[in-house]
């Protein structure tokens, strides 16, 4: 039976790089027999422009029934400061699908080391994953703004913490088997719970080493010794900040994918960068982050490990051959980058 993939086409450069990702998927399917169907839907500003809500009911229904979801950048300056914004649709989708675990791999391509703001010897061997709890804590607590006082409620249950930490340990089992749990347990009650749960979950994974870091120390280590990390797991707010910090290590957002997983429903895969409206429609956007998001989908949702390695090798050899888009120091167009990768499948 064909796998159903919903493609949520966003704003700015979104349509261009989504098509590049889907063309690579199509080329792979022709070689391997992967059976799938694509349900393309506008998302983000396009929905709002059509006088609709940021997350239409039919889009939510299709997403719930899908085997996997591909999403590309949303947002535009025209929605800044207005009541209805594209980002509200994404937040609602995460909540409705219970996408509790955000997975962001950080790996430096050898051929792109020169882009990093850190010295080559400092980023050598960097290959870690940030696992961020995505649906709880202060972002989803009550937000109370008064005339001269404000409160944001930080709230976590045992179950919310347990499932995200368990996810991190499961990922670590297939890597270097080190989990670094990041908290602020010397100050915050939620972090005291976080550390307690981490210690308890670790008992179920005797083959995996658990380490603890306070968030301020972790932020420093991510710059001074990033190769130390294997799997980082942390709460929503800390994860938001640290995952963005980690993205700087590569020197470009154009090659970084991410995934958001639920417990039982479909997962969502997307590049980490924005919609880049300043270059939209010019055919120069880097499609690699979208293509690598497709890679994560093939691996995590469909278990097609050989296919994922095939695309990753094609990306790496294309970069090593000097085929680079403008954001990473070359002159290749979106189409030329995509075609180079397809040719190397």
UniProtKB/Swiss-Prot annotation:
NCBIfam families: leuB (TIGR00169). PROSITE patterns: IDH_IMDH (PS00470). NAD(+) binds at residues 274-286. Its cofactor is Mg(2+); Mn(2+). It is found in: Cytoplasm. Keywords: Amino-acid biosynthesis, Branched-chain amino acid biosynthesis, Cytoplasm, Leucine biosynthesis, Magnesium, Manganese, Metal-binding, NAD, Oxidoreductase. It catalyses: (2R,3S)-3-isopropylmalate + NAD(+) = 4-methyl-2-oxopentanoate + CO2 + NADH. Gene3D superfamilies: Isopropylmalate Dehydrogenase. Pathway: Amino-acid biosynthesis; L-leucine biosynthesis; L-leucine from 3-methyl-2-oxobutanoate: step 3/4. It comes from Streptococcus pneumoniae (strain ATCC BAA-255 / R6). It is an enzyme of class 1 (oxidoreductase). The keyword Zinc-finger does not apply. Substrate binds at residues 94, 104, 132, 216. Mg(2+) binds at residues 216, 240, 244. Binds 1 Mg(2+) or Mn(2+) ion per subunit. Homodimer. Disulfide bonds: none annotated. Transmembrane segments: none annotated. Catalyzes the oxidation of 3-carboxy-2-hydroxy-4-methylpentanoate (3-isopropylmalate) to 3-carboxy-4-methyl-2-oxopentanoate. The product decarboxylates to 4-methyl-2 oxopentanoate. This is 3-isopropylmalate dehydrogenase. The record marks 139, 184 as: Important for catalysis.
